[in-house]
UniProtKB/Swiss-Prot annotation:
Gene: mdtA
Lineage top rank: taxon: Bacteria
Organism from which the protein derives: Dickeya zeae (strain Ech586)
Main location, first listed in the record: membrane
UniProt biased composition (Low complexity): 46-60
Name by which UniProt lists this protein: Multidrug resistance protein MdtA
GO CC terms of this entry: efflux pump complex; plasma membrane
Length: 421
């Protein structure tokens, strides 16, 4: 029992001794505390100065940098835009006008052909035989007519001496007229047979592009069979629509006596495909869409347009003379409507409420609220307030600042990696 108590007493002494030595080891000395206090006292004025200086730098406000451009006065073309579909000027499904065996095809699929060019041939022999028969019948009846006319002349001479009765003379005259009618009928039969023979040669009704053939050589064709589709692409048309509110503008342009120019652009309105002119306008408005159809014609000599192709149409209907234009980037939208920031000679900005018109390229027509020759802010607009002074950057300076701003994160990232390593 006494041994156990002694053992616990010894352990307690060891713990107390360890705690004492630990306290002595980690406790700072008085000289260190004094030095630290002295250093703090000497450093405080400089640190406070630095804080005041840093605070002063954060409190200072530099003029925000902006880019500016001059408004100007110019003549601006006025375009109407619409979505159009290319249509062939003429389209025909070619049939055979006679029935028979298809003997030959004289075109290549997709080929451009001229008006009257031979496309295909039907077996002509049955029609040649029919023509010969008709010509033979005509020759026979013509001979009978000649003989009847000669007999009529004799009867007329004999009737003067009463050797031929009047009835015989009348009968002969009637026979001559009968043969004359027969000859006319035979002439019609010959012409019909000749026409059937001509129809065995199928030709192009106009200049155009041949489509895919729809029947092969050797087949028996009739007038109901489709041989091919021919489309006229030189020239070619585009059908497009404009809102009914623009009808008066289009009519005014048509009445000017000058062709109304029309441009066809690709789907993205990035590349012009062809230039043409307005051809006609429909005679009624589509009540479901509130638009009216117009047709424009293009020469299309380079085959830039193809039937059923979708294109964007720009039609020049007027030219606005001496209007004020400003960069579209400078025009903003707010509660009061469109506005623009204008710079005075002291590089101070003021907000002008404006009325905008049509947009032409990167410029917009300003019909009210801005004069030609005024400087307007095009970049840095989000930091502006009424009457604030700004720093107007030259284009080169603006580009360099933009480049520096873009490179700064990369520089900071490299520096951070260097410190980290």
């Amino acid at each position: 029992m006494n041994a156990a108590r002694l053992f616990r007493f010894l352990i307690l002494l060891v713990v107390i001794a360890a705690a004492f030595f630990a306290w002595r080891y980690f406790r700072p000395s008085q000289s260190d505390s004094a030095n630290e206090a002295t250093t703090t006292q000497h450093a405080s004025p400089q640190g406070q100065g630095q804080n005041r200086s840093g605070s002063g730098r954060r409190g200072s406000t530099a003029p925000p940098p902006v880019q500016a451009a001059l408004s100007s006065s110019s003549s601006v073309p006025y375009y109407l835009s619409g979505l159009g579909t290319v249509t062939a000027a003429n389209t025909v499904t070619v049939h055979s006008r006679v029935s028979g065996q298809l003997m030959a095809i004289h075109f290549q699929e997709g080929q451009q052909v001229k008006e009257g060019e031979l496309l295909a041939e039907i077996d002509p022999r049955p029609f040649q035989v029919a023509l010969i028969q008709a010509q033979g019948q005509l020759a026979k009846d013509q001979a009978l007519l000649v003989n009847a006319r000669q007999d009529l002349v004799r009867y007329q001479q004999l009737s003067k001496t009463n050797l031929v009765s009047g009835q015989q003379l009348d009968t002969q005259e009637s026979l001559v007229r009968q043969y004359e009618a027969t000859v006319k009928s035979d002439q019609g039969a010959v012409a019909s047979a000749q026409l059937q023979l001509d129809y065995s040669r199928i030709t192009a009704p106009f200049n155009g592009r041949v489509g895919l053939r729809q029947i092969d050589i050797g087949n028996y064709v009739t007038s109901t069979d489709n041989l091919l589709v021919l489309t006229q692409t030189h020239p070619i048309d585009v059908i497009f629509t404009v809102p009914e509110s623009d009808i008066a503008t289009v009519l005014k342009a048509q009445k000017s006596g000058q062709p109304v120019p029309v441009e066809a652009w690709d789907r993205g309105s990035q590349r012009i495909l062809s230039q043409g002119r307005l051809l006609s306008m429909d005679n009624q408005i589509d009540a479901t869409t509130g638009t009216i159809k117009l047709k424009a014609r293009f020469d299309n000599t380079d085959d830039a347009l193809f039937p059923n192709q979708f294109v964007n149409i720009k039609m020049k209907v007027d030219t606005l003379q001496n209007v004020v234009i400003a960069p579209s980037a400078a025009i903003q939208m707010g509660n009061e409507g469109h506005f623009i920031w204008v710079l005075n000679d002291k590089d101070q900005v003021s907000k002008h409420i404006i009325t905008t018109g049509i947009q032409y390229g990167q410029q917009t027509v300003v019909s009210n609220g801005l004069n030609a020759g005024e400087r307007v802010v095009t970049d840095g607009i989000d930091r502006l307030t009424e009457g604030a002074r700004v720093e107007v950057l030259a284009p080169a300076a603006a580009d360099s600042k933009s480049t520096a701003g873009a490179e700064k994160p990369q520089h900071e990232k490299s520096q951070h990696n260097a410190e980290k390593s």
